[in-house]
Amino acid sequence: GQCFLTELILAYDFVGKTNKRWPTKHDTILVYVKDPGSYYFDSATVDREPYMAPGLVTPEKVARGKLPTDVWWHTIVPTSGKEKTGYPTQKPAGILRRIIQASSREGDTVLDFFAGSGTTGAVAHSLGRNAVLIDDNPEAIAVMTRRMPGATLRTAK
């Protein structure tokens, strides 16, 4: 069956310099689910955003805010600080926390086929979820091994 659920666009405020094409200012996260018929989503765990035109909605809606759309504005991971792993495509923990918290329950397992720096696994663990992280890049494996020393590492044969 078709297990693709949605595409999330992570737009950020940092733009690399280029004169040869439109500068890239976003990343894409493709969300797949094991069974679309039993997909779990808890909107109550998602921080709400302010309405862009508050005069067009009721005061109650303004006070509550709205559920974010599939385009999220976020800053990139700072070049220094506790969160930075040194992996070039690392995603901010806050982004993964929003996805994992709303899309899974404690004890569920989260799968990341392009795990990179392992942020998905680190966040999943902090939220009481299990994680299966997959990546074929030796640099990614090294970063994840340093980041999660207690994790079980298996390699494909």
Regions found by a protein language model. Name each.
Residues G1-R154:
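Core catalytic lobe of class I
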